[in-house]
């Protein structure tokens, strides 16, 4: 009888197992009937590579264009690009278990404590209740002076680079302004980036930490997350702890302040101090993790929306129409406030269209189908399957939006008119839907509206096409890895400062 040698067995057994695994995923797996690229259906390796490279959501756009609104992108994961999926996956349905976020794709804090981003249904509701006042209309009115203060300070800083004939890098300035604002709203004090004309190092730590999070996600999916410190590139090592340390320092200072500061923590600290062990306040560890989440979510989303809006306005030529609406509506910049800018229809349409083409949070973790399975888009999906809606694939699909690849703010003002009356606006959910939709949506809209209004009232902007290139061609690690955005700035009423 012939027996394979030991060296041969070392090769044959793993190869045989691999072939069996690939064959099962393609021909016998419960999701075998879903379309998708062959290698992605057979193995999770292409998915891991795309996640590490930051190209996942651009790949999903290509796949949905080829295979339709439902695509299998991993042996156990399905991506959707339609309105029904938002409702089936994210909407709250009484009596139905929640589709929880995939734990493999969630960033874990060094202290292992939950935050509003990483929590079960019960604790998520507790966190939202505690932060509810800060993000309510009443809370926004309290925060308005802070938002106005940093928008005005941004205007003053941009005066230094206006009318020089040289283009200014706007992502840098938006990051400074919004990071200062969110610092004041999160911790009762600014990071003073605009005053120092220098970005706080926490911004760099945030961006590099997100890349390291992608690496840890891949290793966690393989059961070897403990190797993360050993495989991270040198420049990324320690960024997770550095990001955490900044939050510790700032929150400790905030907790020592007496009285209301007009920030996110006023009601939380009072409620937590008076908790009496009922469990409806926050522990110190929970406050810390939520503080870190608020800074990242509150600064990056708004800075991205501002950058995207300015680029798309200038590239499309729509900036003249937006500027005209603002200057016609306000005789003085002091007249610009949160209430008045909310009544500018075209500016609001500009923001909505920006978030369609350049969503503030392009990468969201998929949800996990609960026990016993569920029906998604008319088909039964077995439990433990990962399911999600791709923002970019959904918003750039021609079956959802007319001229989907074009920046047309008017589509949001003419929903019942040709050619936009057939657009599927239910598919447009930049802030998600359901119980876990973005709690900071109103604040983000307020900051973007007011900042754009202030800038377009004071200045004329022209895109420096040569230095900027295609601004939308960016990688994504949960948030955009933003390119530089160069613009010529001239003070309103002066001659053009851009080169002829």
From Swiss-Prot:
Residues where heme binds: 438
Residue stretches spanning the membrane: 3-23
Membrane topology qualifier: Single-pass membrane protein
PROSITE patterns linked: CYTOCHROME_P450
GO terms for cellular component: membrane
Documented EC number(s): 1.14.19.n5
Stored SUPFAM superfamilies: Cytochrome P450 (SSF48264)
Recorded coiled-coil stretches: none
Top-level class of the enzyme under EC nomenclature: oxidoreductase
GO annotation (BP), single: aflatoxin biosynthetic process
Keywords tagged on the record: Glycoprotein, Heme, Iron, Membrane, Metal-binding, Monooxygenase, NADP, Oxidoreductase, Transmembrane, Transmembrane helix
Gene Ontology MF annotations: heme binding; iron ion binding; monooxygenase activity; oxidoreductase activity; versicolorin B desaturase activity
Pathway the protein takes part in: Mycotoxin biosynthesis; aflatoxin biosynthesis
The UniProt record lists the keyword Heme: yes
Chief localisation class: membrane
Glycosylation sites: 243, 400
Names of required cofactors: heme
Catalytic activity, as annotated: versicolorin B + NADPH + O2 + H(+) = versicolorin A + NADP(+) + 2 H2O
Protein's cellular compartments: Membrane
Task performed by this protein: Versicolorin B desaturase; part of the gene cluster that mediates the biosynthesis of aflatoxins, a group of polyketide-derived furanocoumarins, and part of the most toxic and carcinogenic compounds among the known mycotoxins. The four major aflatoxins produced by A.parasiticus are aflatoxin B1 (AFB1), aflatoxin B2 (AFB2), aflatoxin G1 (AFG1) and aflatoxin G2 (AFG2). Within the aflatoxin pathway, the versicolorin B desaturase aflL catalyzes the conversion of versicolorin B (VERB) to versicolorin A (VERA).
Family according to the record: Belongs to the cytochrome P450 family.
Name by which UniProt lists this protein: Versicolorin B desaturase
Organism: Aspergillus parasiticus (strain ATCC 56775 / NRRL 5862 / SRRC 143 / SU-1)
Lineage: Eukaryota, Fungi, Dikarya, Ascomycota, Pezizomycotina
